[in-house]
Amino acid sequence: MKLVIDANIPAADACFGGVGTLHRLPGREIRATDLQNADALIVRSITQVNRALLANSPVRFVGTCTIGTDHIDLDYLKERNIGFASAPGCNAEAVVDYVLSSLLTVSEREGWPLLERTVGIVGAGNVGSRLQRRLKALGVAVRVCDPPRAEQEGASGFVSLDTLIDECDVICLHTPLVKAGPHATYQLLNAQRINELAPGTLLLNAGGGDCIDGLALRSRLAGKGDITAVLDVWEDEPGIDAGLRDLVALATPHIAGHSLDGKLRGTWMIQQALAAQLNQPSGMPFSELCPSPALATLTLQSALPVEEALRLCVRAVYDVRRDHDALQRQVMLQGIAKGFDSCRANYPLRREFATLTVYLENDAVSLQPSLQAAGFQVRCG
């Protein structure tokens, strides 16, 4: 059995080596000619899987080690009776880590208390729902907009997008890209809505790049300059708008979910799905794939202000500023598109908050609820 697999998918040998022969290729360079003798195709979000790619291939299974499926022509796979699996939720915790690191960074830079702000979450799926839980556990006021869920579950607990924009200091987008239909998200934040954002609003997009009108956002930032933006996803990746990149507070190259844990979880989920299709044993448990973290423990011996303690622990595991700086460096060296892709392809090892155990001594034990709410393991005494 021949498997064509994105070269940047981790633990490929451990998960798929026993299934067949692996043929590794850069995700953006996978072509139809590479699949002429392939039985399975394993990709990430940068590979467009459609009729043009698969038409003359014997591929019987496609797996994407990502939450989203925008890059997959699902109708064509169904037409050809090609098995398919994605990895919903595999990196959701990592994206929430990214959001918290970003919010703590911007709030420190601008001098406002995050825990006293109202945060709006647009899209309460795998990521948004986890972000909601962590923020509420921290005591942050949260508003949630998710029209499809509101239709299914009832309006209680949800608000409209316009209400969310009116009531929130921070707006986090975690919507998939839906181009048509009653709940389309393409340019969900269009020019009108961007112009309606209150001065001082922080807008963070870790959902879909096309969910925001980039030109309108650039105009608002370059003109009034009275809002702040954090962007991890962009229109026209990897050739993103250099002008917009220069205006946002934090610019990162679509890496919000790029924790080692999330990547391994995605690979493992696709391995499980392929094994099921082949009627083979499911293989090793996920826990055996995860190595021990380089930093496993941290000790706080005295109490700190809560947000200061959060920043200390968050940055011990993941500091979003490093990704922002790395993108700036690589763009200067290689240009926009190559620099963007280089950051993704050579992304440094990153773990999730849950891999760090924080030991609290003396009066630092008062920090236990907040640190646990943020996602860390906590031990007192």
Report each predicted region and the residues it spans.
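Rossmann-like adenosine-cofactor binding region
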Residues: 49, 150-242
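Oxidoreductase and adenylate-handling cofactor-binding alpha/beta cores
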Residues: 96-112, 137-140, 267-276
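Rossmann-like dinucleotide-binding domain for NAD(H)/NADP(H)
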Residues: 200-369, 374-381
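NAD(P)-binding Rossmann-fold cofactor-contacting core
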Residues: 10, 137-154
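Glycine-rich adenosine-cofactor-binding loop
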Residues: 7, 88, 96, 115-136
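N-terminal glycine-/charge-rich "phosphate-binding" loop or analogous flexible N-terminal tail
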Residues: 1-38
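Phosphate/diphosphate ligand-binding glycine-rich loop within oxidoreductases
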Residues: 39-112
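Short, well-ordered coil/turn residues at beta-beta hairpins
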Residues: 6, 43-44, 65, 172-175, ...
